[in-house]
Amino acid sequence: TPGDNEWADCDRKNLTPRYDELERLVFLKTLMFDDKYLEKANTLVDFQQQPSMHENARWRFADVEFITLHIAGTHNGRREVLKSDKQLAYQQADTRDANNLNWLAQANPTAKGYVIAFQADIYTHRTAQPACSKTQPEQCDGFKVYRDALAEFANTVKKPVLVIHGDTGPYCQQPLSENLTRLNVPGDFMFSDIAKVSLVQQDTDVTWQINSLKSGKPLKRICR
């Protein structure tokens, strides 16, 4: 799923050449989601793409549903808009929000667990500002709507939910509620490890087990 380095950061002043970030997003989607992508993706069980936003997808593995959402850093494309039309950037961010929330709401209720993946660290970049919206596109928290939606989703499904993201440095995990866990995957700025994630039965509970693929040891670092 796209992240800020692939499009939202392409207008930075230290880059040569610099690009309009919205133009880069169109280019990126054309490059990524072609016939070869679909040929491989369609080998996944129950693979689907969101018709209105093809980067949002879902599939199943071992009765766990995997869901991708397009949530990029810079508060999902709302901050540091340096070369694009800001009002158009805000409108597109609002559309992404609506599509993402709709896609999450369509999760298959028969799955035994859910893995939800996106690029932005919506937790570390938390602010005290209100959620971004059509009526408040600036001086707002572009990630609040997702923190709230994911918490509500986990509370509704009553099944294990794992949120996977990147964006910030630490390789860590954090239980957010009884059945909601986040994993900040390794790999920002440098390769450090590969996370192996399993859904395991422990007594009467089904929980996520996250281990290092290199050492086999469990991930004990807690995200702050």
Per-region residue spans from a language model:
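Binuclear metal-dependent phosphoesterase catalytic core
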Residues: 169-224
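His/acidic metal-ligating clusters that form di-metal
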Residues: 67, 83-176
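Extended active-site neighborhood of metal-dependent phosphoesterases/phosphodiesterases
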Residues: 1-96, 177-201
